[in-house]
């Protein structure tokens, strides 16, 4: 199985102030004149400073090149039925999640007036896929996790040519159940092997 590894680095020259702590000292690189004027008034040693940048991600994510819709049939998603609590925190910190829902608000002062609002929502919370008549497309948390993961790394790429996930790791950091989106993506290779053998 061949896989593609994605490493996003944050090296940039586009900053006003860089602050790096090394041992007990702070090293500043200032490009902003206003901030520089304030810093010059403080007692400090003037050094040539090269800001520290991330040069390698601690977690490598490998997305199988042969990834397709059949991975949805893998048993790996059942793990998330019990682990995920459907809080939606992973979605709300994600810079690429843009799901929304509509809410109709009625005012008690005047029953003839109301408001329809577009509200940020989460595909991971209960009720997001509810439809008229009491139906719901994804009732189990594992089904929601499957949808989110495949939307980020498979279906979005099929439509747009690149993965939706930017690799920031915010979802890993915020999850109260310590579910790692990165680890989930890394399990896709074995999941593809599983479904190809069945």
Task: List the predicted regions and their residue ranges.
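Conserved small/polar residues in nucleotide/adenosyl-binding loops
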Residues: 7-8
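Internal helical hairpin/lid segments
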Residues: 89-105
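Extended amphipathic alpha-helical segments enriched in small hydrophobics
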Residues: 81-91
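A short mid-domain helix/strand-loop element embedded in enzyme catalytic domains
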Residues: 43-74
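Non-catalytic interaction/assembly regions
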Residues: 16-19
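Ferredoxin-type iron-sulfur electron-transfer modules in oxidoreductases and energy-metabolism complexes
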Residues: 62-82, 100-198
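Long, compositionally biased charged/polar accessory segments in the mid-to-C-terminal portions
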Residues: 21-32
